[in-house]
Amino acid sequence: MVSVPFINGMGLHNLILKREWLDSVIELFAQVEDKTFVDVGVNIGQSLIRFKTICPQTKYLGFEPNSTCVAYAQKLISVNKFQGCIIQNAALSTGVSNLILEKTTVDDSRASLISALRPNYFEDKEHVIALDYDTFYFENEISFVKIDVEGGEFEVLKGMERSLKRHQPLVVCEVLDSLEDSVLEFTQKRASMVCELLDSLGCGIIQLHTKNNKLMSFERIDKIIIKQWTTESPDFNDYLFYPLVRESDVLEKLMSLVTLKL
């Protein structure tokens, strides 16, 4: 049983957290005790809870630019006595820099460093530090990476390019459909940059179709095609990036989840 702290209104989402397809993917691919789960976009620790519930002995390394969310996640780790956890109060990008995180609420899960994706949408800003993964954590053995950064996927992946090539982890990554007509071309261009980078790393792309917290189906694709946002978009905006040398094993395990609808 996980203890959920409430701090200045934060914590409710963790209290109502339900099992979903990501839990099953973690069970299949991330239970490697001598390697690390990298969580890019910790927010208030939703994936931290999922991971530590399933893999209590495996190391966890999280990155989160929102200082309020980091303070909450540290408290979550403390009250539950989660072992082997490090949270870096920084964004991941292509290098060390000072960036602006736009948000509306203190723990806004939609907060983004890419302001052009949601023009004039956010009400608040926070100056944050960014760093590239490779410079600081290249030697760290990775088994699995989760990326949820509201548009900053390319910078995250580019900044950990050498680590991805060396350690060959699986990557679950959200790539959102275009939230406004005016930014559809911009959003597609950024998604295409991600695809080109993955291709250069010898990685394949699988689009996941999820519904009601379950994995319904999946499709091996060459390109991520961005559409205008609809109510169905959340069911098709999650992807699995994987080394092509592991393709047969990855496809076989994913098929087992679809068969069981986990």
Predicted regions and their residues:
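Short alpha-helix
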Residues: 130, 188-201
